Curated annotation (Swiss-Prot):
Localisation: Cytoplasm
GO molecular function: ATP binding; heat shock protein binding; unfolded protein binding; zinc ion binding
The CXXCXGXG motif repeat ranges on this chain: 141-148, 158-165, 182-189, 196-203
A GO term from the CC aspect: cytoplasm
InterPro entries the record matches: DnaJ, DnaJ_C, DnaJ_domain, DnaJ_domain_CS, HSP40/DnaJ_pept-bd, HSP_DnaJ_Cys-rich_dom, HSP_DnaJ_Cys-rich_dom_sf, J_dom_sf
Domain J positions: 6-70
Pfam families the UniProt entry points to: DnaJ (PF00226), DnaJ_C (PF01556), DnaJ_CXXCXGXG (PF00684)
CR-type zinc finger span: 128-208
Required cofactor names: Zn(2+)
Domain-related comment: The J domain is necessary and sufficient to stimulate DnaK ATPase activity. Zinc center 1 plays an important role in the autonomous, DnaK-independent chaperone activity of DnaJ. Zinc center 2 is essential for interaction with DnaK and for DnaJ activity.
Protein name: Chaperone protein DnaJ
Alphabetized UniProt keyword annotations: Chaperone, Cytoplasm, DNA replication, Metal-binding, Repeat, Stress response, Zinc, Zinc-finger
Species whose genome carries this gene: Roseiflexus castenholzii (strain DSM 13941 / HLO8)
Amino acid sequence: MAVKRDYYEVLGVQRNASQDEIKKAFRRLARQYHPDVNKAPDAEAKFKEINEAYEVLSDPEKRSMYDRFGHAGPTAAPGFDPFASADPFSSIFETFFGGTMRGTQRGPQRGADLRYTLSISFEEAIFGVEKTIEYRRMETCPACRGSGAEPGTEPVRCPKCGGLGEIRQRAPLFNMVTVTTCDMCRGEGTVIAIPCRECRGEGRIRQTRKITVRVPPGVDSSAQIRISGEGDAGPRGGPYGNLYVVIDVQPHPFFIREGNDIILELPLNVAQAALGTEVDVPTIEGTERLHIPPGVQNGAVFRIRGKGAPFLRSSGRGDQIVVVRVVVPTNLNDHQRRLFEELARSLENEPIGNQRDEGFFGRIKNALGL
């Protein structure tokens, strides 16, 4: 029976080496003796020896046992490996089915979702628009195709869990077995012995992405547009996540949006309000002629049908709500003052203050049916 070499000697480290030093030594030797890279006849045997040494020395509990008892372990029974994972179910499986029971390994993980805030104008929100955006995301490494391993090599079986993706430990009391995800391979069952130079073993690289986003008519601020598959790439070749484009509509100089209705304040002077007039009212599509009857009051509301924002999930559009604002002059010349004084005398017997004023916002609520 061949005598096993000292594990510290195999990795070329001191007995008081730190975990970081042990890990660096393992990576260096694994790269040197990996069978896909080193074609020497004894390369595979040396690679297995390096994996075995690292499996023990990278685990504090196994390393402590090895430091105390060496290869034999505390119970030097022939054929007994004190550093093998305690898995009573595995031996039963092998007895009946001639195979090895493997722990449940995680499949490819989906990449993270990303968010992008897209600023658009008021008009673009009403009519819709196509915008080209540019953002950064993680993409699958083209060199290793997401595996993380140097091209021409493959990930190797995890030396800590033996490829199970989990660690089984027998509790000293109650004869129970606890199962935890392997912290070395993170449940994948394999580790990267020779990392890809392009992505440094990550399997992904950060790239700039440029795409065209179609913004539908009638969209409003805080709306989200989901673009499938445009988020980050998943680790180890996993599928891409989604990109969520969050809409930010810039305010308009004089239009205010309320749901699918568009509100406009229309300033009128005192004469126009008293005598009535015809005015060209600006809308999102141009101007509309609006008749203002004589005696219109401040805060009066007029509705122009079908001149609001389109409904997102159905046909039709909202309305434009025109709210009258009577502007009282503040600087009168002598002639205007005399005219107002004469008007005031003629209105001395007219009742005032006996009408309930609902206020500006009250009138708008009534117009909107709120």
